Amino acid sequence: MSESLHLTRNGSILEITLDRPKANAIDAKTSFEMGEVFLNFRDDPQLRVAIITGAGEKFFSAGWDLKAAAEGEAPDADFGPGGFAGLTEIFNLDKPVIAAVNGYAFGGGFELALAADFIVCADNASFALPEAKLGIVPDSGGVLRLPKILPPAIVNEMVMTGRRMGAEEALRWGIVNRVVSQAELMDNARELAQQLVNSAPLAIAALKEIYRTTSEMPVEESYSYIRSGVLKHYPSVLHSEDAIEGPLAFAEKRDPVWKGR
């Protein structure tokens, strides 16, 4: 793929390692490449889960490459399919992504992690959105996704002052799923990925579709919406072979064999 991205396939799990010394910062070229990777992951029927991490133990990603910015790359440059870092604007990805945050996740690096479905982080990780101190705003999802997780006062402090949040605080606020040691990070992310593989792929796709389309609706309206037949995956999963296989495997005391149909 490129010198900046290392891809490893472990069965149905794709591991993506961002490797751009010194801080795994992302320029437009790298963002384009990441977008291609995530779109290929989306469209590959053999892949079920992706894990994104950074090389080394200090930086997950420092976000936008300020060296590229100093050389003329604009904040509103074309960062390719999927938006900045290839994931922040893919809104039809019905497979789970795990961010294995191995260190600092700043600016667009934090926004990349927020675009994932799960965040597992090392105990030395920290998170920040310092864009206001650089004369820009975290418009690749930070100022949009973070308010859905945190109270307004905490969001304001993070986006307006650039305050850093450590791993344990992020866990308390529900930003991350797990905090583990650096040595355990990838094994823990892989364990979570395998748990996701053990769930039915159509059910996962339907869940993501429902979350995505009903998150701003009142509950009563959401019920009507998901039962209206307009969704792609939800009606399919109800009449799928997997919906038969799950209860059958349970009754026969064996692991289900999912077909994704």
From Swiss-Prot:
Regarding protein family, the annotation reads: Belongs to the enoyl-CoA hydratase/isomerase family.
Recorded source organism is Escherichia coli O157:H7
InterPro entries per UniProt? Carnitinyl_CoA_dehydratase, ClpP/crotonase-like_dom_sf, Enoyl-CoA_hyd/isom_CS, Enoyl-CoA_hydra/iso, Enoyl-CoA_hydra_C
EC nos: 4.2.1.149
Going by the entry's taxonomy, the superkingdom of the source organism is recorded as Bacteria
Q: Give, as in the UniProt entry, the pathway in which the protein acts.
A: Amine and polyamine metabolism; carnitine metabolism
This protein's name? Carnitinyl-CoA dehydratase
Q: Name one GO molecular function term.
A: hydro-lyase activity
Q: Does the keyword Transmembrane apply?
A: no
Entry annotated with the keyword Lyase: yes
Catalytic machinery residues = 111, 131
Function, as annotated? Catalyzes the reversible dehydration of L-carnitinyl-CoA to crotonobetainyl-CoA.
- Show the catalytic activity: (R)-carnitinyl-CoA = crotonobetainyl-CoA + H2O
- Which keywords describe this protein according to UniProt? Lyase
